[in-house]
């Protein structure tokens, strides 16, 4: 069963170590459907009828549901933004990196909307709802996330303006 789930996510690395492009064509075939948004960087999807929790690789949104911790600045806004990008029923293309799962058992993925090819992880950073979170060996888009976050910070976008203290 796990093999089927992992096979549904495509690995962007080739034998030469290169990665795929970051914006995918709108005609890309979906391999997952949104069931819910848990918070700004975690979603629930179905893959071939099996429900999975997915952690968006390379980004970190402020916490809203971490046990014994207060809701962080801009956490509710980040969750709402992700929910607006990914309404229930949205077709997705999930792309994996080196590791399939995080220590909490969540599937790790770069997430694309198939309707328009939007790279969701990157859009969340670009709009100031997340900071980059680089955890090796899952680093295929790390430089892009860092550069995008710098631009959002320079423009005082989202959390970069609201959470300065």
Predicted regions and their residues:
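Small beta-barrel nucleic-acid-binding modules, primarily SNase/OB-fold domains
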Residues: 2-165
């Amino acid at each position: 069963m796990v093999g089927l789930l992992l096979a549904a996510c495509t690995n962007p690395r080739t034998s030469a170590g290169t990665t795929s492009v970051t914006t995918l064509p709108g005609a890309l075939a979906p391999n997952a459907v949104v069931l819910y948004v848990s918070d700004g960087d975690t979603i629930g999807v179905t893959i071939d009828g099996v429900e999975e929790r997915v952690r968006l690789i390379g980004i970190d949104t402020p916490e809203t549901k971490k046990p014994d911790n207060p809701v962080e600045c801009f956490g509710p806004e980040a969750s709402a933004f992700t929910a607006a990008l990914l309404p229930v029923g949205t077709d997705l293309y999930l792309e994996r990196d080196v590791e399939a799962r995080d220590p909490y058992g969540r599937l790790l993925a770069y997430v694309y909307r198939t309707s328009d090819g939007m790279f969701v992880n990157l859009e969340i950073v670009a709009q100031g709802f997340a900071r980059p979170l680089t955890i090796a060996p899952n680093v295929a888009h790390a430089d892009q996330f860092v550069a995008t976050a710098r631009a959002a910070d320079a423009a005082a976008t989202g959390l970069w303006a609201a959470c300065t203290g």
